[in-house]
């Protein structure tokens, strides 16, 4: 058989073209010590800070400490079958989180694995590194749009704007999480994507929150990132960063995002545990020296982007738990100085039945007033001052039984206003209805109602106002003019008469001159 040299040469040339001379370099190391979720590794001389490393059993860790002779790695998954001498290799990647609309309605862990039993994540647009620089000053815009919480006390006196960072701070069991969840529930139909980051909570608490959001229909636009108390400290450490990375993708698309960190006290404790185990030098309260930077680099990623960048926003509601009301402790003062205001909840208000238990005197919103709706701003200007006077006189009235008429008026009005601010969980009020209620407070129409009937009277107003034409006018104009004020005055006189007519043994002359209602 004759050998066709041309065919052979063509085959050889074809093989040469297909041949790719790739050199794959793999840097491997080995475990020196292991324990408490921390692994010391030798041999990874070129590893990067925050780089993912892979162990021989398929587990992953993050290189957090780069030392001359070893690397301190924090574990992200089970490490019980690893031992001294086991091999470990670099991945060349930093830790990433999934992003995209496929995350809405899902519960995931900080490394992006679904934990809600609904199968794999779908419609994911990609993965993004969880550590990223915040946008600069020139890439931002000042806060100017309101973020409606649906909570009357907040929207009237402590308004929050889109792109603001408002701290919710208070002792345990004072309704901090409830305020955050009510704000999420109120975003229904407002084109705001929500992220709830659970840090160091019980599995049962996360399940309860998921159920509440599903029952209220809020889960359709919400993602839950959960790092529970039973998991490794490293997952609690990365959870908020994973959450804000998910939000940043939506913000870049020009969308509005609300993110809740519940809570950053446990986040700081998790970071302290990791730092001490990595033998980093402890500082005040045994926290490491960069604890302030930990929270500042997280919260600075929230904000309102400029029009050139799509005008998207991330509004952050970090939660901090205090011990015995001490807001001057290390972590609380750190986060207060980073954020744009705080809502302070107290045990005494909560136990007295004032819920949400917001202490208006110690709470502040530094940038929210620029974003407040005009109709609400017109009728809520004097509220904070009135309540401050009420609290002061209420304290003194406990020592004196003989009060003058003017003091009695301030005390009675203050007590009624506090009743108006009581609100049950998952029952948000729309901003037009809030403006109407505040109009009634400002013009003292609530003085005709006995204090123990204020809550029922409030429900009566909310029921009647939506059937009235003036509601649509306020909704359209988003401000009060002379015509609307005239119509609202007539509306309130009418509802006061109708409501008081249902009360047994009611004597209107005890509350003022009845001619005012004519």
From Swiss-Prot:
Keywords: ATP synthesis, ATP-binding, Cell membrane, CF(1), Hydrogen ion transport, Ion transport, Membrane, Nucleotide-binding, Translocase, Transport. It catalyses: ATP + H2O + 4 H(+)(in) = ADP + phosphate + 5 H(+)(out). It is found in: Cell membrane. Its main location: membrane. Transmembrane segments: none annotated. InterPro entries: ATP_synth_asu-like_sf, ATP_synth_asu_C, ATP_synth_asu_C_sf, ATP_synth_F1_a_nt-bd_dom, ATP_synth_F1_asu, ATPase_a/bsu_AS, ATPase_F1/V1/A1_a/bsu_N, ATPase_F1/V1/A1_a/bsu_N_sf. Belongs to the ATPase alpha/beta chains family. HAMAP family: ATP_synth_alpha_bact. This is ATP synthase subunit alpha. It comes from Mycoplasmoides gallisepticum (strain R(low / passage 15 / clone 2)) (Mycoplasma gallisepticum). The lineage of its organism: Bacteria, Bacillati, Mycoplasmatota, Mycoplasmoidales, Mycoplasmoidaceae. The gene is atpA.
